[in-house]
């Protein structure tokens, strides 16, 4: 007597570690609800103020300034170092540091600030800008733009004929109205996408100190006694950072769903007021870079590169992942050309982060931008130069004035360093003969 054959049983593994069993005699059914529930897995929760880069899948956190996030690839990669080259003629770099710190406070992230140049860290933390909603920002920008339009129209009334006013001012008004509507649409769309990634700030108001969590605020100030004993400030700084990084890594390992990112901010790093030990600077950056690679922390440092040689600046820039610089027009000598009248200086990209890859996953369209300070915020914009010659039918400009304006533009940009060499893998502080507008 022949025994019936037992149907063959197959075991299949699906996502999430759930096993499903099928038999050779089973037939497909139309009930798909049971299969979909077993194959879906819950998405892993990201830390506050973070997102995944669509270019290289790195975990990013915001600098606090949307314009800066856009030009460096979406934000600062976790585990990287962002270096800001300070300007000898201004302190605009402090606005970037305050943006970075304020964003960390609002995102309930750990914030560490250190300045060994005689500045009390709490003095900086008490002057962080207050948060402003997107609606308030749009309304403020609209009012500022309207005031600028009225000022320009009143100025044109003294210099233009009535026919010119109707032809130019009316078209200008229509152009600005269209630009405002586009800007509002873009900002409303970005609000939905990035409502928890980057906030807007108003520098005319101060952040409420009581809103800060004392357990998440960490500082390190200059200790004159340790300096007298001969202890290196870089060693003390690294030990303090190392303890904080280990603390946040341990908390993230114990409770992954409540991971907090640690933001490290160091003002005027490697300044002579810290120490004259250049080897200590290189050793500190080596150790810091290795420490951050396996952590949930990111670091922003500002460096007064104008006091060091080009070779030493290249070493520092090589150990940092992202390098940007601010160069103000003040102190360059001569008058600022009319085309740059509303701007305060140039903002250059020296280096883009390359984490977990050998090549650049983000290629910026430009390396040189311009920045300006509005009443409430800082803006980084693309350079737009007007055409050299006027349109057909208009009065021809004087050749001498045209040549003078062109030479002024060339002179003012020739005094700024180009970052194209470092971006392609070279060192920092490019040759002064390079034109930063040669993209």
Swiss-Prot record:
Pathway annotation: tRNA modification; 5-methoxycarbonylmethyl-2-thiouridine-tRNA biosynthesis
Bias kind Gly residues: ranges: 422-431
Main location: cytoplasm
Gene Ontology MF term list: phosphorylase kinase regulator activity
Region (Disordered): 386-439
Keywords: Cytoplasm, Nucleus, tRNA processing
Top-rank taxon: Eukaryota
GO CC list: cytoplasm; elongator holoenzyme complex; transcription elongation factor complex
GO biological process: regulation of transcription by RNA polymerase II; tRNA wobble uridine modification
Sequence ranges of Basic and acidic residues compositional bias: 391-407
Keyword Membrane: no
Location of this chain's protein in the cell: Cytoplasm; Nucleus
PANTHER family linked: ELONGATOR COMPLEX PROTEIN 4, PAX6 NEIGHBOR PROTEIN PAXNEB
Record function comment: Component of the elongator complex which is required for multiple tRNA modifications, including mcm5U (5-methoxycarbonylmethyl uridine), mcm5s2U (5-methoxycarbonylmethyl-2-thiouridine), and ncm5U (5-carbamoylmethyl uridine). The elongator complex catalyzes the formation of carboxymethyluridine in the wobble base at position 34 in tRNAs.
Similarity comment text for this entry: Belongs to the ELP4 family.
Subunit structure, interactors included: Component of the elongator complex.
Annotated protein name in UniProt: Elongator complex protein 4
Organism: Dictyostelium discoideum
Source species taxonomy: Eukaryota, Amoebozoa, Evosea, Eumycetozoa, Dictyostelia
